[in-house]
Amino acid sequence: MRFGVVGFKGKMGKVILDVFSNDGHTPILLIDKDEIIEEDFPEVIVDFSTPDALEKTSSYCEKYNSNLVIGTTALTEKHFKILENLSKKVAVVQSYNFSIGINILLELLEKATKMLNDWDCEITEIHHSKKKDKPSGTAILLKNALNREVEIHSLRLGGIPGDHTVLFSNEGELIEIKHRAISRKVFALGALKAAKFILNKKSGFYTFKDIIKEAFI
């Protein structure tokens, strides 16, 4: 697979570049704020950078007819409109979290919330101190899976890649459902699965849920 990385000098970009390359794929488009390395046309472009980069990323996808894997968080309605328009021309996989564990957890929560709908419920999420958006995109995904109004408590500490806990409680019991990312590599491995998933697709908008369904159902 010929691939491109937007934000290749960032922490996540470096991990993506490493994971894809070690799996035998060839980086031929590397984009960052101060440098662009353009060797050939990529089959898939991966962007885990910032919302501000999305318009440029979209233009490269259109230029090369490249499919897109996007894990950027804090997207607005404007950004989703860009992705919607792009998905009419190429295949797009968008998620706020590309770890397999979180996406399985989302499936579990959709079932659990129906059985625990009269229990109190709150979400806590902890990320590294340099993460700007609060709450995290993953916490929003968890809240959406619960399909109810819940408080989200956000902490920014040290270098934690991602720690999410959903708590259910009644007067005598507490259930904690927790996911902890030990390394950023888990997100890059998920992005690789997503890239392989859309490699030969012509167009359409997909989420990581579609990939989980194909893999496990």
From Swiss-Prot:
Q: Which residues bind (S)-2,3,4,5-tetrahydrodipicolinate?
A: H128, G137, T138
**Top enzyme class of this protein?**
oxidoreductase
Any signal peptide, and if so, which residues? Answer: none
Q: Which UniProt keywords apply?
A: Amino-acid biosynthesis, Cytoplasm, Diaminopimelate biosynthesis, Lysine biosynthesis, NAD, NADP, Oxidoreductase
Q: Per its record, what are the GO molecular function terms?
A: 4-hydroxy-tetrahydrodipicolinate reductase; NAD binding; NADP binding; oxidoreductase activity, acting on CH or CH2 groups, NAD or NADP as acceptor
Q: Does the keyword Cell inner membrane apply?
A: no
**Gene Ontology biological process:** diaminopimelate biosynthetic process; lysine biosynthetic process via diaminopimelate
Q: Does the keyword Transferase apply?
A: no
Tell me which CDD domains the record gives. Answer: DHDPR_N
The protein's annotated catalytic reaction(s) are: (S)-2,3,4,5-tetrahydrodipicolinate + NAD(+) + H2O = (2S,4S)-4-hydroxy-2,3,4,5-tetrahydrodipicolinate + NADH + H(+); (S)-2,3,4,5-tetrahydrodipicolinate + NADP(+) + H2O = (2S,4S)-4-hydroxy-2,3,4,5-tetrahydrodipicolinate + NADPH + H(+)
Where does the record place the catalytic residues?
H127 (proton donor/acceptor), K131 (proton donor)
Q: Where does NAD(+) bind?
A: G7, F8, K9, G10, K11, M12, G71, T72, T73, S95, Y96, N97, F98
Q: Which GO terms describe its cellular component?
A: cytosol
E.C. numbers? 1.17.1.8
SUPFAM superfamilies in the record, alphabetically?
Answer: Glyceraldehyde-3-phosphate dehydrogenase-like, C-terminal domain, NAD(P)-binding Rossmann-fold domains
Q: Which family does it belong to?
A: Belongs to the DapB family.
HAMAP family named among the record's database cross-references: DapB
Summary of the function given for this chain in its UniProt record: Catalyzes the conversion of 4-hydroxy-tetrahydrodipicolinate (HTPA) to tetrahydrodipicolinate.
Q: Which PANTHER family does UniProt cross-reference here?
A: 4-HYDROXY-TETRAHYDRODIPICOLINATE REDUCTASE 1, CHLOROPLASTIC-RELATED, DIHYDRODIPICOLINATE REDUCTASE
Q: What is this protein called?
A: 4-hydroxy-tetrahydrodipicolinate reductase
Organism classification, top ranks?
Bacteria, Thermotogati, Thermotogota, Thermotogae, Thermotogales
Gene name tied to this protein: dapB
